[in-house]
């Protein structure tokens, strides 16, 4: 890439150490180009956003745009994935993975608006995020150039980044003592690095940011009612709210009771394994509530296919293919399956556990008359004999043939 060809870059900016260093680095290495900082508000800590515009300008940005994406993030990105029941490798609720496409999409929109000719991000060359950002850029604005400083510069350590900023009199709150890498949005917070880099080290209290240690959570369980309409959470404890408000309400309860902690080793798209501690309190409660209604409403084959959709969706989202046709197809199928998934679930929150203890739906296929262990007048037990004979016919034929 010819650096002189780039006049204006829109950078996905967080205000952290890496992106604070990227602003002056871009100006130094790309012909003193103009750098516009873009900050996506996806529900991260308000402290992270406080003063972020001034910080970007002090680092050398010509402008800083903070865009509120919270409601859109939950409604148009989290809910479609939740509807499929997607869990990457069986446990990860895809908090970071779902946030990247909406951030990159809004970044592209700003770049087109301000007349930029390039996009930049602070993802490292080891991680998945570089793929997620750049796949979105390519899908939405292939004409824009892409700059990935971590794949170009020689600043390979936290100490080097701090020295780089100090030499240019750019203030930062980062220190060498902040050894963990974290990503936060309304759905979750992840912690990587530090003691977690050895899988033989147990996580410690510094690895958990939001949630109360389940052992220190209240000794008394708390009940919460969640309302579902067509596979989406629409209310909490009888109050109808927006998707983001529902998540906020459930996050508060989940944090209090230590809900939604996982400590996992996952397979990254780029080939290596990584370890992280993830906290998804409200999302874990939402998933349990949705599963409760699905158990009532979906027949056996429908539920099996919903599971298949969730498995495939988990890889599509994790791998950064949000804007691929396959994601849209999976989402369309999930919405069809969720058309009757409406109802109410009461869940018990207690020391890290969430349990659905009551559930109801006007579309329920559960029939107490058929399911009872007591005497009933609707189910003829003798009918089972013919069903079993036909169901097991292949096994019968195989056994008979083996004796010949």
Curated annotation (Swiss-Prot):
Does this UniProt record's set of keywords contain Nucleotide-binding?
Answer: yes
Q: Which reaction does it catalyse?
A: L-citrulline + L-aspartate + ATP = 2-(N(omega)-L-arginino)succinate + AMP + diphosphate + H(+)
Q: Which domain of life is it from?
A: Bacteria
Q: Where in the cell is it found?
A: Cytoplasm
Molecular-function annotations in GO: argininosuccinate synthase activity; ATP binding
Print the organism lineage: Bacteria, Pseudomonadati, Pseudomonadota, Gammaproteobacteria, Enterobacterales
Q: Where does L-citrulline bind?
A: 92, 97, 128, 132, 181, 190, 266, 278
Q: What is this protein called?
A: Argininosuccinate synthase
Kindly list the positions annotated as binding L-aspartate: 124, 128-129
- Chief location of this protein within or outside the cell: cytoplasm
Pathway(s) where this gene product acts: Amino-acid biosynthesis; L-arginine biosynthesis; L-arginine from L-ornithine and carbamoyl phosphate: step 2/3
* Protein species of origin: Photorhabdus laumondii subsp. laumondii (strain DSM 15139 / CIP 105565 / TT01) (Photorhabdus luminescens subsp. laumondii)
Q: Which UniProt keywords apply?
A: Amino-acid biosynthesis, Arginine biosynthesis, ATP-binding, Cytoplasm, Ligase, Nucleotide-binding
* NCBIfam families registered for this protein in UniProt: argG (TIGR00032), PRK00509.1 (NF001770)
Q: Which family does it belong to?
A: Belongs to the argininosuccinate synthase family. Type 1 subfamily.
């Amino acid at each position: 890439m010819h650096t002189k060809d780039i006049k204006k870059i829109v950078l996905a900016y967080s205000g952290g150490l890496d992106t604070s260093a990227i602003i002056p680095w871009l100006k130094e290495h790309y012909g003193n180009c103009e750098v516009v900082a873009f900050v996506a508000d996806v529900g991260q800590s308000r402290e992270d956003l406080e003063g972020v515009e001034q910080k970007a300008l002090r680092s050398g940005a010509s402008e800083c745009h903070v865009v509120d994406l919270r409601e859109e993030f939950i409604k148009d990105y989290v809910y479609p994935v939740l509807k499929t029941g997607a869990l990457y490798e069986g446990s990860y609720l895809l908090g970071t993975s779902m946030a990247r496409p909406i951030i990159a999409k809004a970044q592209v929109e700003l770049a087109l608006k301000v007349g930029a000719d390039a996009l930049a991000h602070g993802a490292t060359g080891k991680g998945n995020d570089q793929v997620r950002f750049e796949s979105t850029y390519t899908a939405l604005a292939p004409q824009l150039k892409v700059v990935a400083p971590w794949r170009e510069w020689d600043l390979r350590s936290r100490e080097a980044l701090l020295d780089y900023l100090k030499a240019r009199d750019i203030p930062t709150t980062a220190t060498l003592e902040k050894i963990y890498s974290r990503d936060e949005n309304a759905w979750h917070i992840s912690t990587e690095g530090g003691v977690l880099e050895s899988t033989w080290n147990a996580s410690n209290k510094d690895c958990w940011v939001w949630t109360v240690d389940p052992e220190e959570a209240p000794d008394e369980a708390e009940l919460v009612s969640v309302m579902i309409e067509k596979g989406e959470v629409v209310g909490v404890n009888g109050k109808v709210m927006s998707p983001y408000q529902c998540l906020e309400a459930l996050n508060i309860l989940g944090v209090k009771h230590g809900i939604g902690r996982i400590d996992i080793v996952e397979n990254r798209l780029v080939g290596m394994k990584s370890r992280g501690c993830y906290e998804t309190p409200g999302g874990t409660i939402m998933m349990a509530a949705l599963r409760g209604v699905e158990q009532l409403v979906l027949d056996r084959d429908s539920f099996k296919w919903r599971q298949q959709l969730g498995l495939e969706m988990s890889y599509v989202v994790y791998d950064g293919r949000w804007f691929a046709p396959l994601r849209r197809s999976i989402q369309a199928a999930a919405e069809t399956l969720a058309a009757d998934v409406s109802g109410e679930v009461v869940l018990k929150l207690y020391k890290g556990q969430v349990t659905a203890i009551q559930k109801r739906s006007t579309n329920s296929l559960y029939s107490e008359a058929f399911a009872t262990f007591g005497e009933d007048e609707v189910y003829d037990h003798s009918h089972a004999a013919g069903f079993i004979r036909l169901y097991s016919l292949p096994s019968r034929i195989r056994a008979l043939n083996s004796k010949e």
